[in-house]
């Protein structure tokens, strides 16, 4: 069986360095808020081209804390609206409602699955205060246009970069476009820890200072609490492991991009919709880092069964949109036909930096041999 993502083989590439990092942390006797965290925050800031990185416990906390910090600064308040695409993973919406804000779920661009600038503009009201573009599946959103729109309407922009590590437009990385960004380092991400981890990036010094406190019980100095904060700290061990893996992110990105190109050039089945036209991709390679390679078909269950029978593991990202989840039942009557069509048709096939040429060819052959009997 070709695994959807072989985390063991990915991390085995760096096992000596990862084990050295573990030993270094163990021997240091300092396990929370130490030099490993400082080093990773510094290196990740350099990687993203930003002034500040704030390590936190996970990607959801990253988004939640940015919105919370803007509330502390008086830039937003409970009841304000946040525009987000309706086909996102539920964490994007959870961060909004956790802060007493109102998610405005808008239809995505049917071709990119990302926020449509036209749909953002149509959704703006007097209560709109934030745009939350999710760079879904590894493709960065149309950030120059989104930032121009945000500037025109005086809106804040919070990038959800949980799936877009290393993506860029004109050399400017995801995480350096909006007023702030949230990253996840969940093990399956393109830059994955060996446990839960996350980070916030920003160029706003005032925002960063509040976030440094909010993640640590609302405190800059022990036992002096400025805010009603939380415990959301990126620990020393995960920071050390991430520092190792960050060095290789660029190479892994190129490998993913090469696999994606092989898929785009060679999967040819009228029953399967590919995520991009190959020429479109070749002209904008840096914009997609292929966290996921998501195809679409009206016959998803049959295709998934066919691929399984051919020894290929697949996953669905995502089977149920947020507005159809029980947690958000009050939104279930929303008319979002594009979103619902996407969730009914998408299927993710294997793409990972340790895939062999034989495995790639097998996936292509299996996709091309799919037929409706």
State what each model feature region is.
Residues 13, 76, 256:
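Pyridoxal 5′-phosphate
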Residues 71-136, 140-161, 168:
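PLP-dependent aminotransferase-like
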Residues 1-30, 310:
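N-terminal "arm"/small-domain region of PLP-dependent enzymes with the aminotransferase-like
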Residues 183-184, 198-203, 243:
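Short beta-strand-to-turn element immediately C-terminal to the catalytic PLP-Schiff-base lysine
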Residues 30, 34-81, 95-99, 105, ...:
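Phosphate-binding glycine-rich loop
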Residues 8, 37-42, 47-54, 60, ...:
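PLP-dependent aminotransferase class I/II
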Residues 159-194, 209, 221-226:
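Conserved active-site segment immediately N-terminal to the catalytic lysine
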Residues 95-96, 149, 173, 190, ...:
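Hydrophobic/aromatic ligand-binding patch that stacks against planar heteroaromatic rings
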